[in-house]
Amino acid sequence: MEDEDDGTLVRRCRDGELKAFDQLVLRYQKPVFNAAFRMLRNPEDARDVAQTVFLKVFEHLEQYDPNLKFYSWIYRITLNESINALGRLRPCEAISGNETDQSPGLEQQVENEQMSRAIEQALMRIQPDHRAVIVLRHFLHLGYQDMGDILELPEKTVKSRLYTARQLLRDVLVEDGVC
């Protein structure tokens, strides 16, 4: 039963099987949390968003189109909820997250940590729609087609938005003296 695909689990959920929903939650709780955390940089806020996402998934499961990929649908909800949460946060709260790096050498670890922190802070200074494409591509390692499905954009628009987002991020990093 654990190897069931998303579509089968969704069908079982729609038939009222709560255990199937539990399996979906187990399957997606880390990816949803990670996506929210990459957008918000705060574990408590990311947990709140993840909780809201699964509540919305449960409440709106009947609206899910089984012809689409389930993970695209849940990531879309996650991004929307993360953007909503960003609107409720003050900028200082949004960049307070702390992520450690597992580099082998201490000096390299410190450098990587400083660069990660600078990138996190720079990401928080660009618009959420631009931040979202960077998170999807570089942190969640999604392809352009999947990104387009999640963002409900054509693939060319995704590529264009990613190019613009990278330029904006680079500009902020240059302005901060990082690059």
Tell where the protein language model's regions lie, with residue ranges.
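Short, charged helix-capping/linker segments at alpha-helix termini
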Residues: 2, 14-23, 33-52, 155, ...
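Internal acidic/polar
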Residues: 2-3, 84, 91-116, 143
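Sigma70-family region 2
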Residues: 14-15, 38-41, 52-69, 88-89
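Amphipathic, Lys/Arg- and hydrophobic-enriched alpha-helical face
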Residues: 25-43, 60, 123, 168, ...
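Structural recognition of an alpha-helix C-terminal capping motif at a helix-to-coil junction
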Residues: 34, 48-55, 68-80
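Arg/Lys-rich amphipathic alpha helix in sigma70-family domain 2
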Residues: 62-66, 76-96, 112, 164
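DNA-recognition helix of helix-turn-helix
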Residues: 72, 79, 83, 130, ...
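A short pre-motif secondary-structure segment
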Residues: 133-137
